[in-house]
Amino acid sequence: MSNSIDSQSIPTISPTDYTKFDPDTIHEKLDASLSRPQLNTDGSIRHFLGIEGLNKAQLRAIIAKAETFFDDKGQLINRPELEGYTVMNLFFEPSTRTRTTFEVAEKRLGANVLNIDIERSSTKKGESLRDTLWNLQAMTADIFVVRHSASGAAHFMATEVTPDIAIINGGDGWHAHPTQGMLDMLTIHREAPRPFEELSVAIVGDIKHSRVARSDISALQTLGVKDIRVCAPRTLLPKGIERFGVQVYENMNECVTDCDVIMGLRIQNERIGSPLLASSSEYYKHYGITPERMALAKPDAFVMHPGPMNRGVEIASSVADGAQSVILKQVNNGIAIRMAVLSLAMEGQRAHQAAGN
């Protein structure tokens, strides 16, 4: 099997081929070589596949759209912008927060919601993703929300679906988790006392295997954050991560000193092929987000985590449940961001069809 991907070959490659690539390089191969058909010619969203390729104005437009789903008291509101449309949730990987918040977002927008039971689907019987996709298209859904263990699966589906269907990436392998990245940006936008351009952000944990880290770093850079710090054992850092324009720290205390935002990441045990840590207790000792380390950050700093958390390994319970934690706010903000992305994707599809494409 070839170790290279080019945009000409995408329609004939199964997404399972992408899992052959090492997480050290998967982001480069996907972002440099894959066709990214996520924008219409007018710049509106046709599919939402990743943060890369979107500019600052487009990210700010998503944040601004999400803000419209909060009332004056900060409570989420319903708005039937997708009434009469059908959204199909295709989660080929287990999920609690992402799947549930997408479903809540879809229902708040008035959409008809179809949840496909993947455990009973034909993909479990050996059917290819392409054949599964073509059969699901016959159900006349307007939007597919896709989570898959193969990096590039959402891109693959975007090249295969009919023009009247939008694909939203709910997380693909090691590659990207764009709605998580955007809900993190919305959270920072709502909680930080300073604009993005003046923030120092520390990202701590399993960066090598984290699709969240890739999306967050890309979004932070696009929104103008100049001081992005990462800290993890060398075994959990992608090779050459410095090329992303981040500062790499080996010492956790130095990394979080004077930071505005500390973002913890889960250790991706299900994606790690062999042991990369001495022990959980050693990890917590050197890299855990503790009250003592939070005290090194700025007085108004806050902590974030995409979940699920490993308490006592990645983060102390007193921090996760403390006054500086915005972790539960992230969940609520996730509903607003997913409402925004769903609404903008449907607007983009209507614009695409109106243009006669």
Curated annotation (Swiss-Prot):
Q: Which InterPro entries match?
A: Asp/Orn_carbamoyltranf_P-bd, Asp/Orn_carbamoylTrfase, Asp/Orn_carbamoylTrfase_sf, Asp_carbamoyltransf, Asp_carbamoyltransf_Asp/Orn-bd
Keyword annotations from UniProtKB, A to Z: Pyrimidine biosynthesis, Transferase
> What Gene Ontology terms describe what this protein does at the molecular function level?
amino acid binding; aspartate carbamoyltransferase activity
Cellular component terms (Gene Ontology): cytosol
Per the record, the domain of life is: Bacteria
Kindly give the Gene3D superfamilies that the UniProt entry links to this protein: Aspartate/ornithine carbamoyltransferase
BP GO annotations:
'de novo' pyrimidine nucleobase biosynthetic process; 'de novo' UMP biosynthetic process; amino acid metabolic process
Q: What class of enzyme is it?
A: transferase
**Is Ribosomal protein a UniProt keyword of this protein?**
no
- Key word Transferase present in the record? yes
- Report TM segments: none
Q: Which reaction does it catalyse?
A: carbamoyl phosphate + L-aspartate = N-carbamoyl-L-aspartate + phosphate + H(+)
Pathway(s) per entry: Pyrimidine metabolism; UMP biosynthesis via de novo pathway; (S)-dihydroorotate from bicarbonate: step 2/3
Q: Which annotated residues bind L-aspartate?
A: K125, R211, R266
**Catalytic activity, EC:** 2.1.3.2
**Which residues participate in carbamoyl phosphate binding?**
R97, T98, R147, H177, Q180, G307, P308
Q: Which Pfam families match?
A: OTCace, OTCace_N
Report biased composition (Polar residues) as residue ranges: 1-17
* Reported function: Catalyzes the condensation of carbamoyl phosphate and aspartate to form carbamoyl aspartate and inorganic phosphate, the committed step in the de novo pyrimidine nucleotide biosynthesis pathway.
Family as reported in the entry's similarity comment = Belongs to the aspartate/ornithine carbamoyltransferase superfamily. ATCase family.
Q: Which PANTHER family match?
A: ASPARTATE CARBAMOYLTRANSFERASE (PTHR45753:SF6), ORNITHINE CARBAMOYLTRANSFERASE, MITOCHONDRIAL (PTHR45753)
Identify this protein by name: Aspartate carbamoyltransferase catalytic subunit
Instruction: Tell me which species this is from.
Output: Psychrobacter arcticus (strain DSM 17307 / VKM B-2377 / 273-4)
